[in-house]
Structure formats: structure tokens, C-alpha cells
């Protein structure tokens, strides 16, 4: 069936197109003769650029249009940055493949300062993420943190125009766009715990499409998949969208999973942290158990405030 064209639904930002092209190249390498086509689309998250993400309903903001295209048969797969993928999928769709993780860290970018520590009090730092905001505010309450929207190029332009003294971006995105020279300081997980799935590319498709799933199988990276499974299980139990102050990062150390997580008040005034270690086979159970601990230790109240009074169940 290699005469059939495999269609990839993708957003049109340079980073989204890089991810789609990456998957296209991997598929063509794994299956010589396979025809793969990109189907670029505009999502709601690409259109609403004048409002902080947390205020426009973060769940699925960048994926719903892509999912509709798959359900209607206009596309076979959708390629996502894993940190943008909601915890729930529409009926008939699922996450079937997670590619090898790139750099999961956040990156400090500035034209005048080499690190967060060098920023003078009152410096303006841009980020679109409540997770980054809460961690930065906790360590540097003297900084002014302002919302920053748009694709990577737009955000860098705003920095270069002097609207911000520094901005925080995902290291993987900068590296994929060959902009790693802009990184002044990669932030360790201890400095800024990454988002769920950060640095990994995920592939969603129809669950009844065995042909496509077979084609995708060689692209799955087992170690990344188990790490992201633990992170996502924790996030699911917390009922976290992609725009809540939740950080989660799993590492595999000698076959054992080490999962760290945090939930923070956006202003940095409260931070609930926890960690778990256990066998990789228990990835989901570890994630759920850690989420329960966080909820019991104050995360429930923090998230309820973020959700405007709608407490997680």
C-alpha cells in the first residue's frame, strides 16, 4: 500500500513545520517509496495572540483543528510538541508514537545578561507559561514577569526590540530552528522544572487505522515513551491542561524511573514539590501516586485558584 499518500496535519509555525518535516523524513527513511504529504493548518492558538494562553482555555488550543482533520479523513496523523498535547483525546483518536526526546530544558535568552542571577531588580522577563512564571517568581520575586505570545521568531523580535530584558523559551525549539546561539543559559531541572513531555514530539492518529500505526511503529522511542507516560499520568490525575503551573520531569536511571513534579501559585508565593522513584513498568502508577501526594500537600488549593474556583476532583 505504499502508493497511498500519508497525510500529516500540522500547524504552520516554523517550529511545527520542523516537527512535521522531521516525522516525514523519519517515515520516508523507514519506508522507502512511501509518499508523505504535509497538510498545514491554522489553530485557535495561532489566531488568538493578544491574550495570555492561560486565559483562553489552554487545553487543546493548538491541536483541535488537527484532530478534526484526522476524524474527517483529511489527514492521517498529527504531529505535536508533547507539551501541547491535552490529557484527553477525542473518541477514536490516540497518541500512538512518541519520538526520542530532545533537550527538555528551558532556556534563558537575553541580549544583555548572561544568566537569571545577573538580571537587575525590576528587569522585565517574558514568558507565556505559568509554570515558568511561578518558578521564576519564586526564586526572583524582584523581577517583572510579563506575558509573551507568538512563535519563536516573534518572541525573539520582541526581545530584540527592547520590550523585554530577557525571555524564557524551550531549549529544544531554539535548537531545532538552529537558534541555539541565542541561548545564554540552559536552565537545569533544579532551576526550572520542565513541562510535561517537553522536548519530545508525539504522533496522534486514528485508533482504527492499523496501516498508519504499523508505519509509525519504528519511530517510537521506548525510553522516551515511558518517561513521558509517567509525566502525563501525573498531569492527568491533576487534571492539568498545557496552561497550568505544573512541572513534571522523569528520568530513567539504571532502569529505574525518577519522577519529579511541582505545582506552584503563578506569583511564586506557594510551591508544592515531590518526587518518586520506582520501576519503569510502573510509570503510570508512579505518576498517579505523586499527583495524589501533591494534591494532599496543597496543590489542590493552588489549582482551584488557577481554575477560578473549580477545584480538581
From Swiss-Prot:
It catalyses: 4 porphobilinogen + H2O = hydroxymethylbilane + 4 NH4(+). HAMAP family: Porphobil_deam. One of its GO terms (biological process) is protoporphyrinogen IX biosynthetic process. Pathway: Porphyrin-containing compound metabolism; protoporphyrin-IX biosynthesis; coproporphyrinogen-III from 5-aminolevulinate: step 2/4. GO terms for cellular component: cytoplasm. Belongs to the HMBS family. Keywords: Porphyrin biosynthesis, Transferase. The modification S-(dipyrrolylmethanemethyl)cysteine is found at residue 242. It is an enzyme of class 2 (transferase). Monomer. The porphobilinogen subunits are added to the dipyrromethane group. It comes from the Bacteria. Tetrapolymerization of the monopyrrole PBG into the hydroxymethylbilane pre-uroporphyrinogen in several discrete steps. GO terms for molecular function: hydroxymethylbilane synthase activity. Its EC number is 2.5.1.61. Its cofactor is dipyrromethane. This is Porphobilinogen deaminase. Binds 1 dipyrromethane group covalently.
